[in-house]
Amino acid sequence: MERTDVKNNRTEEYSTGQIRCIEKSDPEYPQIMKQYSSMPAKLYVKGRLPDPKRRTVAVIGARMCSPYGRIQAFRYAKALSEAGVQIISGMALGIDSEGHKGALEGNMPTFAVLGSGVDVCYPKSNRKLYERILWENGGIISECPLGSGPVSWHFPARNRII
């Protein structure tokens, strides 16, 4: 895909409402985040935001983790999901990805907060997970503008949202 095609696709997603920009003053902006001054002025959202009436648990951890760690992250997220708890994570390789997969296996939406724009799947190897999160009524969330690639300083900032 050429660069102009990518830009046109992003513009189309945004203009058709597939991607929303939610400002802090918007009623849809998560109330819990409004309590903290360090939160971003706006969020970009593809899909849904977590339901504020449901409990939400973050499943986060190492990218380079043991097989045991992967299994446990998946199991905990699945059990929480089966109990009606929403899972939020960063969609990174390792523990984060297993948390999302466990939530989906437990039949609850899951929410990924990215260190890139919501239109940039990172890591690329998680494309199927990214698409499944959206397909299963979850959401992709970021404070990074559309088209922003993953850069090292985005990830600590992303973590405060999780």
Predicted regions located by residue number:
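Glycine-biased, small-residue-rich flexible motifs in mid-sequence functional cores and linkers
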Residues: 2-5, 12-162
